[in-house]
Amino acid sequence: MRFAALETSTDWCSVALWVDGEIHSLERRVPNRHSEYALPMLESLTRNAGRLDAIAFGAGPGSFTGLRIACGLAQGLAFAHGLPVLGVSTLEATAEEAGAPRVVACLDARMREVYYAALEKRERRWHEVIPAQCVAPAEAPKPPGESWVGAGNGFAAYGDFGLRKVLPEVHPTAAAVARLAAPRLAAGEGVDAALAVPLYLRDKVALTLEEQRR
């Protein structure tokens, strides 16, 4: 199986190519400039790859603009080449990058909130112990038990949430998206491009003036 993966939900823009279990990837930190870099990076990576079987992308949550870029690019390529598309949770991709079996994934959602989930890896898949949510840091639920590792830039912005170990530098990558997408695509979970949608977790992009004064 050969497919491409995209991830543009944070300041990082990354692309990956999966070829029969081998991953090739490119990554660059380009805040607010993903639209300039994503397609050229992907074209550079896949130029000599031959026909792709699918497109995977980081569906969210994350930057609204970044999610639309990844989803739109995945849809455009899928429509053009008749390929299925698969969206992958950016919180799961963050957990995948953390390298631990029990991960609290926490991404800065701005507006004094975080995108947050507690995930446990069983049988090569991530399972939600605490469902993905957009929440104020002080209201984030604590995961049960011990041995949880925190991962994501939400910890850089708001502290360690009481966890013993946090990895604030960890972020979702296209390589992680590819690793998570591979078994799902093999199982036929890819969908028509028209059905691919971002996962926002909230429906507002800015605070009102009243909210800013609080």
What name fits each language-model region?
Residues 62, 77, 150, 178, ...:
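A residue-level signal for conserved active-site and pocket-lining positions in enzyme catalytic cores
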